[in-house]
UniProtKB/Swiss-Prot annotation:
Official protein name in the record: UDP-3-O-acylglucosamine N-acyltransferase
UniProt subunit comment: Homotrimer.
HAMAP family from the UniProt entry: LpxD (MF_00523)
SUPFAM superfamilies: Trimeric LpxA-like enzymes
Amino acid sequence: MTYTLAEIAIKLDAKLIVPAALDEQNEALTQISGLATLAKAGTGQVAFLANSKYQQQLSSTNASAVIVSPDAVEACQVSALVMDNPYMGYAMLASLLDSTPKVSCGIHPNAVIADDVLIGENVSVGANTVIESGVQLADNVSIGAGCFIGHGAKIGESTILWANITIYHRVEIGHHCLIQASTVIGSDGFGYAPVKGQYKWHKIPQLGSVIIGDHVEIGASTTIDRGALDNTEIRDGVILDNQIQIAHNVIVGENTAIAGCTVIAGSTVIGKNCTIAGLVGVNGHITIADNCVFTGMSMVTKNISQAGVYSSGMPVVQNKEWNKTNARVKRLDSLTKRVKELEKLLAKN
C-alpha cells in the first residue's frame, strides 16, 4: 500500500510544508510506502520527531518527509507533515501502512471444532486449533494455528488470537481484542489450603472465570488466572505487555497499561487509567486508585488511595558505591540508637 504525501496529509489532518528549494507540486505527489526512524529512513519513507533529543537528526535525515510539531518546522530540511502531536501522527500512519499478514484465512481442514460451536460470519481458524463444545465465536474472529479454546468460552466480534494461545473453559473475551502468541487465559489460580499439622496442601478448585473487556490487547506469554469464586476481570481498553502474571480475582480497571514482567497477586483491584512499568510487584488484596503511575521495579505493598507517581527501589550505581551504601544500611540500627542516646544527653544539658 502506498500513498502520496498529499493523501497522507489529509488522512493525518496535518499541514504539508515543502522547503522553498523543492517543487511543491512534485513533493505532494511523492509516493510513500513505509515508515522509519530519522537515522534510517530513505526515499519513499516518512520519519517522525516526537523527542527533542533527536532533533539534530532533522538536518541529515534522508526521509522523504518528517512528521513534526510546529516548533520544529524550521529545522526540517525535507518536506514536513506538521501536527501538534507527531507521535500520534506516527501511530496513525503506521496503521495506514501496516502490512502484517492475517492470522489465518478461512477454517483450516486440520482444525478440530466441536459440532455445537456457534460460528459467526467471516471467522478464520488456523491449522491444529482445537475448539471444544459450547464455544461461541462472533463475526470476524480470527484464531491462529495451534490454539485451544475450552468448553463454553466466548470470543467477541473482530477479536484476533495469534498462534498457540490457550483459552480455558468459560472464559469470555470481548470484541476487537488482540492477543499475542502463547498467552494463557483462565488457568487455575494459585489456591491451596494448608493441611493442619502437616506439610501438605489441599488444592482449592477455581470456580470463577476470566472476563476480558472490549478493545483489550494482551502481549505474548502473559498469563491470567481464573477466579477462585468471583471472576478475574480485565476491563475495556486495558493494554498488557508480554510475560505478565495476573493472579486470581484481580480486577484491572479501564484503560490501564501494564508493562512486561509485572506480577499482580490475587484479589487486588487496580483502578482506571493507571500506568504500571516493567517488573513491578503488586501485593495481593490491596486497592489502587485511578490515575496512578508506578515506575519500573516498584514494590506495591499496601493500598494506594490517591492518584500520583510512585516509586521504590534503588537505581543502578557502580558496585563499589553500592557496597558502601549497603554497609551503611546494615549499621542504621546501631546508628539510630547512638543518635537517641546523644539526644538524651543534649536534653539533660
